Amino acid sequence: MASKDYIFKMMAASSHSSDVREEHDFYSTEPKAVEDLLRYVDLQHKVTEPSCGNGNIANVLLSHGHEVDAYDLIDRGFGYTKDFLSDNTQIEGDIVMNRPYKYAMEHVSHGMSILKEGGKLCAFLKVQFLESQKRKPLFDAYPLKYMYVFRKRTNSYRNDDRSLGGSAVCYCWYVWEKGYTGEPTIRWID
């Protein structure tokens, strides 16, 4: 008989996980996922990463010549400490983030509110972020421009612990552009 963990993963029922969540929702981004984003999205020179964790996103951006303002609510040894949600300073350039899961909507909404016109916000999120009546006002206020879905699963690691293996979660890059008013375009990352 298959284990409970195996069955849930096969059903893609990640919301039924019996794993303990990381206290501050730190799930690091695979650097390859950021490389993939940069193949499709032309970012401005200056990029803010407001949930930098251990620097996986920022390091890829730096290696591509971007000037990166990287910070996090929790000091994880990279960037500096700052509370993104309580800072209303207008952002110069673009934002790239893998925000704490439980505050995803708040991070996207706040980021869009402090971006300059034409600035992009790229958020590494679950595909299921599209669902929910609760997020409808966010998508109404800030129409999504692009959604880049990974054809092959990419991972987000609790506390950057890669020994925990993969998951059945489907992630993608959501890309908003301040001032965009059209319909979203879905593209795939091979």
Regions found by a protein language model. Give the residues of each.
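Class I S-adenosyl-L-methionine-dependent methyltransferase catalytic core
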Residues: M1-D190
